[in-house]
Design a protein with these regions (language model features):
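Nucleotide donor/acceptor-binding cores
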Residues: 2
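C-terminal substrate-binding/catalytic lobe of Rossmann-fold NAD(P)-dependent oxidoreductases
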Residues: 5-7, 12-67, 146-235
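A conserved short beta-strand
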Residues: 31, 96-97
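An anion/phosphate-binding loop that grips the pyrophosphate of nucleotide cofactors and donors
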Residues: 70
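N-terminal Rossmann-like NAD(P) cofactor-binding module of classical short-chain dehydrogenase/reductase
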Residues: 73-74
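Conserved NAD(P)H cofactor-binding loop of Rossmann-fold oxidoreductase domains
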Residues: 77
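Rossmann-fold NAD(P)-binding glycine/threonine-rich loop
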Residues: 80-92, 99-122, 128-140
Length: 235
């Protein structure tokens, strides 16, 4: 049994991971970890993740108190908490799966470096189809990126905290790399005012409304035609 800690158990992904782990014959939940000051700290993991029953697994606000009991940490929390989790995972030499978004390029490098010393998976989006889409974006950019205008439109529910989304940023980084530039030098988030579109830029548009599931569309606009590559979640 792989002893597992879930960081950010109250979020959508945290609840889902808890359910999957509880149903799994290979995973054993040993603790949940939430941000300091949350009213659910001290409660049972099964209750706060809406499983409707106790699991006999505590939710704490200090990972260092429970980390020695685990084999792997699964983190879908916040940028600030994610960096704390990373440092503790390195210190205690624990495997880490991180799907938290919002990190800048320097912070992402910290995860890459950690992968040299501990088992590490960092992904802004763990969907198989999103990763297929990323491959398609690389192919499209190599073929037509320099002769088209590129725009990224992403849509999420009203509770999404970061914009553009981590997945959208990752897509932009792949495109920028294929074009031989940096996303930080080419990204334009939204548009306002007057003036023509600057060549070589990558536009971003973030929509937040209701309970809308994750949606990402990348448009390559030419003259007389355009290509759209999209991924839409249904839940």
């Amino acid at each position: 049994m792989i002893k597992t800690i879930v960081v950010g158990p109250r979020g959508k992904m945290g609840r889902l991971i808890t359910k999957i782990a509880d149903d799994s014959e290979d995973l054993e939940l040993v603790a949940g970890v939430g941000p300091r000051g949350r009213d659910y700290i001290g409660q049972d993991l099964g209750q706060i993740t809406m499983l409707g029953r106790d699991l006999g697994v505590p939710v704490v606000d200090d990972l260092s108190k429970v980390i020695e009991a685990c084999d792997v940490i699964i983190d879908f929390s916040t940028k600030e908490m994610g960096l704390e989790v990373l440092e503790l995972a390195k210190e205690y030499e624990k495997a880490l799966v991180c799907g938290t978004t919002g990190f800048n390029s320097v912070e992402k490098d910290l995860f890459r470096q950690a992968g040299e010393t501990i088992p590490m998976l960092y992904a802004a989006n763990t969907s198989k189809l999103v990763n297929v889409m990323n491959k398609l974006l690389q192919l499209a950019t190599a073929a037509i990126g320099e002769e088209t205008d590129i725009e990224i439109v992403e849509m999420h529910d009203r509770w999404k905290k970061d914009a553009p989304s981590g997945t959208a940023k990752e897509m932009g980084e792949l495109i920028a790399h294929e074009l031989g530039t940096e996303l930080s030098d080419t990204a334009v988030c939204g548009r306002e005012g007057t003036g023509e579109r600057k060549p070589g830029t990558i536009g971003y548009h973030s929509i937040r409304m209701g309970d809308t599931p994750s949606s990402h569309t990348v448009l390559f606009g030419g003259f007389g035609e355009r290509l759209e590559i999209s991924h839409h979640s249904t839940d």
